Amino acid sequence: MTIFAASVFDATVIFEDKELFKGRGAASVWAEKLAKEIESPVTVEKIGTGWALRGQVDGVDCTWGILGQRLKRIT
């Protein structure tokens, strides 16, 4: 099962129509899991009132949030 199929049961906030992690700690745990999945470094970044995951896939900068209890690329 990929990390993108795993349920995200952590607290979230909505900022500018994007669902983000409420806490940095939860975002950091998911950043570690995502980094293993995509085999590339992933960091957490404060966006408004929440935390998103940031990394690169195939040389393209990506940001991940949450949609329906799943990780989703938002940029």
Residue ranges: model-predicted function:
Residues 13-26, 34, 67-68:
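A short, exposed loop/beta-hairpin motif centered on an aromatic-Gly-Thr core
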Residues 1-16, 47-54, 60, 66-69:
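Short aromatic-glycine-(Arg/Gly/Cys) micro-motifs in beta-strand/loop hairpins
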Residues 22-41, 75:
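A short, charged, amphipathic alpha-helix used as a generic interaction element across diverse proteins
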Residues 11, 19-21, 40-42, 54-55:
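Alpha-helical interaction segments
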Residues 27, 31, 42-44, 53, ...:
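Hydrophobic beta-strand residues in large extracellular and virion-surface proteins
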